[in-house]
Design a protein with these regions (language model features):
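Active-site histidine-anchored catalytic micro-motif
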Residues: 1-139
Length: 139
């Protein structure tokens, strides 16, 4: 069995943002030499997310609006977590909704996506460096 573990680093300017990381992950799958297996892509921070969806700007904007309606950043004192001196409770909630990781099958050496599927890094408390783990295993 082959395996590859790599770290990706992101520093998104601004509080929130989405980064399409599909191409980067595809290059790592090729580097791994795995033909049949699994690829885990995991946000290693509690205010960031990895998720799969369509790479369409309108949809990404809709996510931004929807998440802000569900867990607005302000007023920050609405959250008990922020009463400890933090100001990012909304980011924790947004991450919980969007998820921590994705696992994608590798078939014939390629990520086996459905139509339009892409992998995204979601940042909800930006302006600092954060890590994503990519682990690929298989034959």
């Amino acid at each position: 069995m082959k395996s590859l573990t790599e770290q990706l680093w992101f520093e998104v300017p601004g509080r929130r943002g989405f980064v399409n990381i599909t191409g980067t992950v595809e290059k790592l799958v090729a580097k791994s030499g795995v033909q049949e297996g699994l690829c885990l892509v995991n946000a290693m921070h509690i205010t960031a997310s990895v998720f799969i969806n369509d790479a369409e700007d309108g949809l990404l904007h809709d996510y931004e609006v929807w998440l802000e309606e569900l867990a607005p950043h302000a007023p920050t004192d609405q959250y008990h977590h922020n009463r400890t001196g933090e100001d990012n409770a909304d980011a924790h909630l947004k991450r919980q909704i969007m998820g921590r990781e994705v696992v994608v099958a590798i078939t014939k050496g390629k990520l086996d996506f459905g139509p339009w599927e892409q992998i995204f890094y979601g940042e909800f408390d930006g302006n600092r460096r954060k890590r994503v783990l990519v682990k690929i295993i298989g034959d």
